[in-house]
């Protein structure tokens, strides 16, 4: 057993209750494409677990069509904005220890005042992005 930095090496939770340490996270879109290829056999049941530190608001919206995403704030505060597919919107500010769920098909982004760290548990298959 070894200790691993989740910010550097995310975890894939897969079919059959597997947990796979992922290669070094680069933040590039190619990393996510390679991740999808590595775990294609898990389909919509796979989950990517990551932790990110933010010092600025997001410059994109994202949407996960294949499943829910859990956003767990572990430090600081972040304001999560959601645009649901029925046209409604929601906003919630999370502080350390609080979480929210982005339902499948919900566009979401976040604002950060200062800095914040969050853990994401994401059904990433088919994830889309658009400019903010």
Regions found by a protein language model. Give the residues of each.
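Double-stranded beta-helix
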Residues: 2-14, 109-132
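Short histidine-centered beta-strand/loop micro-motifs
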Residues: 38, 58-65, 82-83, 91-92, ...
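Short, conserved beta-strand element in jelly-roll/cupin
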Residues: 65-80, 84
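Short acidic-glycine-tyrosine-enriched beta hairpin
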Residues: 84-104
């Amino acid at each position: 057993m070894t200790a691993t930095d989740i910010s550097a090496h995310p975890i894939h939770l897969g079919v059959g209750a597997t947990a796979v340490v992922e290669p070094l996270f680069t933040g590039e879109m190619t990393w996510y494409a390679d991740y999808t290829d590595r775990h294609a056999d898990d389909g919509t049941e796979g989950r990517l677990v990551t932790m990110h530190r933010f010092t600025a608001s997001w410059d994109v919206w994202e949407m996960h069509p294949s499943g829910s995403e859990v956003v767990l704030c572990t430090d600081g505060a972040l304001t999560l904005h959601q645009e649901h597919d029925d046209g409604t919107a929601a906003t919630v500010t999370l502080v350390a220890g609080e979480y929210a769920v982005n339902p499948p098909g919900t566009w979401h982004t976040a604002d950060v005042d200062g800095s914040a760290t969050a853990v994401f548990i994401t059904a990433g298959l088919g994830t889309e992005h658009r400019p903010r």
